[in-house]
């Protein structure tokens, strides 16, 4: 695929440190979105835009100043609100440099829908390649997904293998065999299978794959999505994981 006509670049800009944001609705962000699918527009200071240091690859593969909601033109079937991406970026920018966020998450998606060859997977990889083409360097994949896979025992049983395959596929297709991947252990979903899913996520043992536990973060009234404040906290936890475990080796 030729991205040469799609990417707006500025050769004077330093190389962007690229972070792929992927998974389902809690990565896309539902913070501040009410039951009537209306976002309250509240942006905490931790999620503030920074026109010099935090950018976003939009749906048209152009860089723009990143601001909430990060996934508004990516996860288009639902109203997006605050997710963890902006608080993460603000927390790492002073150490990591100019940040390029690549939002790819889509609400309500199961891990099998992210298999190589499917639309979601190919879109994620193509967006990541487009970001690199414009002068960026991929630093990590942030992954928050799994609620949809608590629907049945079969889904739970297949999750570990599907997630490990996804990790190996992404690394191979991006040519980054040691790509850091920070996944989030879910805290919502079908209660019957939730704890088993969390055990699976926390137990994935692949080099440069770590897990941040969302346990204790506040859920909205729907008991599925994180509140705005919880998303801010999650972004900070993801940032600490990256800074403490991966920044030096990158």
In which residue ranges do the predicted regions lie?
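Cell-envelope and extracellular/periplasmic
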Residues: 2-250
């Amino acid at each position: 695929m030729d991205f040469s006509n799609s990417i707006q670049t500025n050769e004077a800009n330093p190389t962007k440190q690229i972070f792929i944001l992927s998974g389902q609705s809690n990565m896309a962000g539902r913070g501040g979105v009410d039951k009537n699918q209306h976002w309250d527009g509240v942006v905490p200071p931790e999620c503030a835009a920074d026109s010099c240091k935090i950018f976003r690859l939009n749906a048209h593969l152009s860089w723009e100043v990143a601001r909430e909601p990060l996934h508004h033109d990516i996860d288009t079937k639902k109203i997006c609100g605050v997710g963890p991406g902006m608080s993460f970026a603000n927390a790492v920018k002073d150490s990591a440099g100019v940040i390029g966020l690549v939002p790819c998450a889509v609400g309500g998606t199961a891990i099998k829908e992210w298999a190589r060859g499917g639309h979601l997977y190919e879109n994620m990889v193509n967006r990541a390649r487009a970001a690199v083409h414009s002068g960026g360097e991929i630093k990590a994949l942030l992954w928050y997904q799994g609620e949809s896979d608590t629907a049945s025992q079969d889904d739970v049983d297949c999750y570990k293998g599907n997630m490990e395959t996804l990790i190996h596929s992404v690394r191979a297709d991006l040519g980054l065999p040691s790509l850091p991947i920070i996944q989030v252990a879910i805290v919502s979903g079908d209660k019957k299978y939730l704890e088993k899913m969390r055990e699976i996520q926390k137990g994935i043992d692949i080099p440069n794959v770590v897990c941040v536990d969302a346990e204790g973060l506040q859920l909205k009234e729907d008991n599925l999505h994180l509140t705005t404040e919880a998303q801010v906290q999650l972004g900070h936890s993801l940032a600490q994981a990256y800074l403490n475990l991966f920044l030096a080796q990158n």
